[in-house]
Amino acid sequence: MEKWWFNSMLSNEELEHRWGLSKSMESLGPIGNTRGSEDPIINDTDKNIHSYSWSDSGSYSCSNVDHFFGVSDIWSFISDETFLVRDSNGKGYSVYFDIENRIFEIDNDSSFLSELESSFSSYLSNGSKNDNRYYDSYMYDTKYSWNNHMNSCIDSYLRSEISIDSYISTGSDNFSDSYIYSYIFSEKVSGSDSESSSIRTSGNDSNFNVRERDNDFDRNQKYGRLWVQCENCYELNYRSFFRSKMNICEQCGYHLKMNSLDRIELSIDSGTWNPMDDDMVSMDPIEFHSMEEPYRDRIDSYQRNTGLTEAVQTGIGQLNGIPIAIGVMDFQFMGGSMGSVVGEKITRLIEYATNESIPVIMVCASGGARMQEGSLSLMQMAKISSASYNYQLNKKLFYVSILTSPTTGGVTASFGMLGDIIIAEPNAYIAFAGKRVIEQTLNKTVPDGSQVAEYSFHKGLFDPIVPRNPLKGVLSELFQLHGFFPLNQNSSGARGSVICSE
């Protein structure tokens, strides 16, 4: 285990504030920023390093630890995993964490620390800084420059070791204005495989209470307000920036699920969205009996949690100035299942577009027909298909279907596959019956990847696969190719009417 010495040139107060370590000079806080209040993880009265405990301010602290030292070899420190601290009594400890093996270790080998201190003094007196090809004389001239450089190194260390972005605000002594986010105890989580991490100690006089941490699922829930974990590469994406990235993983480019509100914002010009039938709600038409939760109560619960009235939002707006009618399904509302209200809203949308002669976009994300409404939900397939037939074949208008993940069941068997142009998102799960249903029904194994968009594309099931970034531009070009133009280019015609319908 390599250990690097820290120099006390750093100001305690500035170190605490700028690294977000603590609010007092007597405490050493975390390299991290989380939420909530949890049980203590470590207790050690002998070393006077008391419990690591979560606080409402988003930091945890170890009382009576005085400060980090400094670094003798700053470039070697970046890839190291051990830090040395000294408590208020002048006693030194080495703090080690192994991210890969999820180990947190504290040691107080006094002989080793004394040897290091002697080596460090010799290092400075011999002028080793001049031999370092990375050394910048100005960098070490002032305490302020040291702090800035140390901040940069801590940031680089976390980026390289934890594989996530961290953010450090320098030049401010205000604790609330400076922060650093990291995820010390977990890195790449592999799907359903759950591993438990532990905290252990070394040293003859150590008396720590070791508590095994929760599994990956619980840990990810705890940090869910800060990070979004990619379903494909399991890397973490900072939640505050994730929406601006269109829910696309910055590491691997995987398209994660997107709610209907974000999709509307992505596709529709700002200030042009006008919802339709947003007050229409389900009324439990067959009085579905459930041992767990009544259907109406379940609907109410989803309405409170999502802010939606049903699993689809319909309305009119403009896409790059072109008037359109659009329906966007939301998988967060009962899995985007299609009930009588969903079918009615989509049917009314298509009928409105037929009367106004404007193009229709349907963004599909659904698990299929809603079982709580029985055959009434299956009837919606025929009702929507009938309205679509009149719109497409009789009126010669243009319908675009966008298949997102997942699109299955009755939606796949009806309006999802009826578009004049059928667009799929990359790696979207598109099928009629899900993998589990097929395997349990036919007792056969469904090959991996046989129900993703790329496989179906090569079989000719739909037209292009379009990522979210260029989607709006692609739709705009398709509409203009089929005779629909922005209002300012088609002032002589009615709202985006077809100029060339044949």
UniProtKB/Swiss-Prot annotation:
Q: Can you list the GO cellular component terms from the UniProt entry?
A: acetyl-CoA carboxylase complex; chloroplast stroma
Q: Which residues form the CoA carboxyltransferase N-terminal domain?
A: 226-497
User: What molecular functions are annotated in GO for this chain?
Assistant: acetyl-CoA carboxylase activity; ATP binding; carboxyl- or carbamoyltransferase activity; zinc ion binding
Keyword field = ATP-binding, Chloroplast, Fatty acid biosynthesis, Fatty acid metabolism, Lipid biosynthesis, Lipid metabolism, Metal-binding, Nucleotide-binding, Plastid, Transferase, Zinc, Zinc-finger
Q: How is the cofactor bound?
A: Binds 1 zinc ion per subunit.
- Region (Disordered) location: 191-212
Subunit structure as annotated in this protein's UniProt entry: Acetyl-CoA carboxylase is a heterohexamer composed of biotin carboxyl carrier protein, biotin carboxylase and 2 subunits each of ACCase subunit alpha and ACCase plastid-coded subunit beta (accD).
- What is the purpose of this protein? Component of the acetyl coenzyme A carboxylase (ACC) complex. Biotin carboxylase (BC) catalyzes the carboxylation of biotin on its carrier protein (BCCP) and then the CO(2) group is transferred by the transcarboxylase to acetyl-CoA to form malonyl-CoA.
**Name under which the protein is recorded:** Acetyl-coenzyme A carboxylase carboxyl transferase subunit beta, chloroplastic
Q: Which organism is it from?
A: Chloranthus spicatus (Chulantree)
